[in-house]
């Protein structure tokens, strides 16, 4: 209802003012929406904004299209307040299943996220990427878009050559119960130490890079087998966080089918190309026209391609097969992403929309796979589950161990996902163990608990007749009006690629529901008032469920 009402007011205002751009803002304590259009008209009409606002208020109040909406002038501002009809229509929509889900749109979106190098387990920095990307994908689907979520697999990088070297010369086998990605990390760290101690062995890494570029069958098979094992470990980690990819795209495939060479051939013909010379055998691009002083290297002097060359082929393929291309990448990728976008534009190919995120860390310190001093995502999840079990045990000591552990696993996922998604991508953050698991504050479990409370109220109430009127208290009205905004929040998230807005909305919804429940008796109410409030609880429960699922958090009925 909020989006429809916003659009209606915007259209009517444009019609009666002849303005092409109308900005409607939150009305704060005075109204639901407000407009400053009187300021723009004042310059044209040579009248005071206050006078214009008063005249417009009279005109708009008499407009039958705005029936049920109170229009008032407050100084130079126009205020719009929604009436009982708005509340009733919101409730009728919100008690339906799949509230907030938009009709299917004829737009195909490809969204790439995570795409971590397969040389060790995911750490907390990687899973910020995963959670941002997964939440965006869920929001796009909620908004009616067809989305394919991809993981771009780096199976030709130098890191993989080092992993292969380690398995050939240093591997002592996996430890009992050790995940494949953790095993690979141990071998990778050992191989790096061996190469640092014996620099002459670096020639073997160079040889492996030459072989994979030439698609040597034995090398290609070994690289893919090792990478696949690491990816299997990644999938287990991401499954524990409710993160899923639709498709894994291998960078070596773009070399195998010739797409990369086609791209390099096209780029060799543009004015920005810097061909190899006897002194410098690299092939690069001069991107100074885009503000980049450093050359964009695409092929090394030994003839092997670099990651950027394969990435260009991948992005051209995405741009030709999807309507929107979205990448979720760390802030450390800003330079290479900028060079990629510049290059794609030079050859008239579709550039990606990029969500850059700053790093997330733990209070214990930083993470580095190469040095072997990192906190893996698996360790983070395991520790959070232990803490969640302790919390659930205190709150529900009577439940069976199996039920306790299942609830704790969901609570742990909620704690991690919410604590990471609540911060806007461009801000760095430190993961807070205590705050993430706080049932009584602004956390994932806090929103889950509000949903479980709504379910409990409905279960205790038994059957009732839905009623959409008689909502009069300020707590009821505030809750309904917030529920009405859910579809517009989804639209804002996908338009601006700002998934943290969804977390803020969920927290505020839980706050408003808990405040309503505290001040307005539901089960102790009588007659029509009880039915109206139970209908509001049902609407809140369904909206909480939808927003939790869009956040990738389990909507538990009992905690």
Curated annotation (Swiss-Prot):
Keywords: Aminoacyl-tRNA synthetase, ATP-binding, Cytoplasm, Ligase, Nucleotide-binding, Protein biosynthesis. It holds the Pfam family DALR_1. It comes from the Archaea. SUPFAM superfamilies: Anticodon-binding domain of a subclass of class I aminoacyl-tRNA synthetases (SSF47323), Arginyl-tRNA synthetase (ArgRS), N-terminal 'additional' domain (SSF55190), Nucleotidylyl transferase (SSF52374). It is found in: Cytoplasm. GO terms for molecular function: arginine-tRNA ligase activity; ATP binding. It is an enzyme of class 6 (ligase). A motif ('HIGH' region) lies at residues 116-126. GO terms for cellular component: cytoplasm. GO terms for biological process: arginyl-tRNA aminoacylation. Its EC number is 6.1.1.19. InterPro entries: aa-tRNA-synth_I_CS (IPR001412), Arg-tRNA-ligase (IPR001278), Arg-tRNA-synth_N (IPR005148), Arg-tRNA-synth_N_sf (IPR036695), ArgRS_core (IPR035684), DALR_anticod-bd (IPR008909), Rossmann-like_a/b/a_fold (IPR014729), tRNAsynth_Ia_anticodon-bd (IPR009080). Disulfide bonds: none annotated. It catalyses: tRNA(Arg) + L-arginine + ATP = L-arginyl-tRNA(Arg) + AMP + diphosphate. Belongs to the class-I aminoacyl-tRNA synthetase family. NCBIfam families: argS. HAMAP family: Arg_tRNA_synth. This is Arginine--tRNA ligase. It comes from Methanosphaerula palustris (strain ATCC BAA-1556 / DSM 19958 / E1-9c). The gene is argS.
């Amino acid at each position: 209802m909020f989006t429809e009402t916003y659009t209606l007011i915007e259209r009517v205002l444009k019609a009666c003012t002849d303005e092409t751009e109308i900005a409607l803002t939150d009305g704060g304590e005075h109204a639901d929406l407000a407009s400053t259009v009187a300021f723009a008209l004042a310059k044209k009409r040579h009248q005071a904004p206050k006078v214009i606002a008063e005249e417009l208020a009279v005109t708009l109040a008499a407009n039958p299209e705005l029936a049920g909406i109170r229009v008032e002038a407050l100084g130079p501002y126009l205020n719009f307040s929604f009436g009982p009809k708005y509340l009733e229509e919101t409730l009728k929509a919100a008690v339906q299943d799949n509230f907030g889900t938009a009709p299917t749109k004829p737009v195909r979106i490809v969204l790439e996220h995570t795409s971590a190098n397969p040389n060790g387990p995911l750490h907390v920095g990687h899973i910020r990427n995963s959670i941002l990307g997964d939440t965006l994908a869920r929001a796009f689907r909620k908004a009616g878009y067809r989305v394919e979520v991809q993981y771009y697999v780096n199976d030709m990088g130098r890191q993989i050559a080092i992993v292969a070297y380690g398995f050939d010369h240093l591997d002592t086998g996996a430890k009992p119960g050790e995940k494949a990605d953790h095993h690979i990390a141990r071998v990778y760290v050992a191989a790096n130490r061996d190469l640092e101690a014996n620099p002459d062995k670096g020639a073997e890494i160079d040889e492996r890079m030459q072989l994979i570029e030439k698609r040597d069958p034995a090398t290609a098979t070994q690289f893919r087998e090792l990478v696949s094992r690491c990816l299997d470990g990644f999938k287990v980690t991401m499954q524990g966080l409710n993160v899923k990819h639709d498709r894994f795209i291998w960078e070596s495939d773009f070399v195998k089918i010739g797409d990369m060479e086609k791209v390099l051939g096209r780029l060799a013909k543009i004015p920005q190309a810097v061909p190899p010379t006897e002194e410098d055998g690299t092939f690069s691009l001069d991107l100074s026209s885009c503000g980049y002083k450093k050359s964009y290297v695409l092929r090394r002097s030994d003839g092997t391609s670099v990651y950027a060359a394969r990435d260009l082929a991948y992005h051209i393929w995405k741009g030709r097969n999807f309507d929107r291309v979205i990448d979720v990448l760390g802030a450390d990728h800003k330079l290479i992403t900028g060079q990629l976008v510049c290059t794609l534009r030079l050859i008239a190919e579709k550039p990606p929309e990029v969500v850059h995120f700053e790093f997330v860390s733990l209070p214990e310190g930083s993470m580095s796979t190469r040095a072997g001093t990192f906190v893996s995502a698996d360790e983070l999840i395991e520790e959070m589950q232990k803490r969640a079990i302790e919390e659930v045990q205190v709150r529900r000591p009577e439940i069976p161990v199996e039920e306790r552990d299942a609830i704790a696993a969901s609570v742990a996922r909620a704690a991690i996902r919410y604590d990471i998604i609540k911060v806007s991508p461009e801000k760095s953050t430190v993961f807070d163990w205590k705050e993430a698991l706080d049932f009584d504050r602004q956390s994932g479990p806090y929103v889950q608990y509000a949903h479980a409370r709504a379910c409990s109220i409905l279960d205790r109430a038994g059957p009732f007749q839905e009623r959409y009127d008689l909502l009069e208290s300020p707590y009821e009205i505030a809750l309904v009006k917030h529920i009405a905004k859910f579809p517009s929040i989804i639209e804002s998230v996908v338009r601006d690629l700002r998934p943290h807005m969804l977390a803020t909305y969920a927290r505020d919804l839980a706050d408003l529901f808990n405040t309503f429940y505290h001040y307005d008796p539901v089960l102790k109410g009588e007659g029509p008032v009880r039915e109206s409030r139970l209908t509001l609880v049902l609407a809140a429960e369904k909206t909480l469920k939808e927003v939790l699922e869009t956040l990738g958090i389990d909507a538990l009925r009992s905690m």
